[in-house]
């Protein structure tokens, strides 16, 4: 399971160091794609396959399903770690998530999320302020 928060910088070649604790779980080859809230999602191959199978069950007749799967899959890219534990993030994904230098990499159960530090600070502060309300809303999910 991925968990924790780490800060790293993207170098001038668009490479990002993946935290050592995440490398083994991600494996040598994994998938990175556009996430929600202007971040990137990265999935180990096994988790990506599970997600892909679920998304393939969405009805093609639903416009939202078509739009979501187009957006999600068109941004997907297979990545691999180099010998220094870095990934080269495709330029379209760097642009989507406004990633320039300072990043925050967080573990979220079955995936990691890659955020620009400024965007993460905004999202985190907003969640922190409303955490009690968020927790109350999760009661219906048996958490």
From Swiss-Prot:
Presence of the UniProt keyword Repeat in the record: yes
InterPro entries: MraZ (IPR003444), MraZ_C (IPR035644), MraZ_dom (IPR020603), MraZ_N (IPR035642), MraZ_sf (IPR038619), SpoVT-AbrB_dom (IPR007159), SpoVT-AbrB_sf (IPR037914)
Gene3D superfamilies associated with the record: Transcriptional regulator MraZ domain (3.40.1550.20)
Biological process per Gene Ontology, one example term: negative regulation of DNA-templated transcription initiation
Any one GO cellular component localisation term in the record: nucleoid
Pfam families: MraZ
GO MF annotation terms: DNA-binding transcription factor activity; transcription cis-regulatory region binding
Location(s) in or outside the cell: Cytoplasm, Nucleoid
Xref: NCBIfam families: division/cell wall cluster transcriptional repressor MraZ
Assembly, per entry: Forms oligomers.
Designated name of the protein: Transcriptional regulator MraZ
Organism of derivation: Listeria welshimeri serovar 6b (strain ATCC 35897 / DSM 20650 / CCUG 15529 / CIP 8149 / NCTC 11857 / SLCC 5334 / V8)
Lineage: Bacteria, Bacillati, Bacillota, Bacilli, Bacillales
């Amino acid at each position: 399971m991925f968990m924790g928060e780490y800060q790293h910088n993207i170098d001038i070649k668009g490479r990002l160091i993946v935290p050592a604790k995440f490398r083994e779980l991600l494996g040598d080859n994994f998938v990175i794609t556009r996430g929600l809230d202007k971040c990137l999602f990265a999935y180990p191959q096994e988790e990506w396959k599970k997600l892909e199978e679920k998304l393939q069950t969405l009805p093609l007749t639903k416009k939202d399903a078509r739009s979501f799967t187009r957006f999600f899959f068109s941004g997907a890219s297979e990545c691999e770690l180099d010998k220094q534990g870095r990934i080269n993030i495709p330029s379209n994904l760097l642009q989507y998530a406004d990633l320039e230098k300072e990043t925050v990499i967080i573990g979220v159960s079955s995936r990691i999320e890659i955020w620009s530090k400024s965007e993460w600070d905004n999202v985190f502060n907003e969640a922190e302020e409303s955490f009690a309300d968020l927790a109350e809303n999760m009661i219906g999910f048996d958490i």
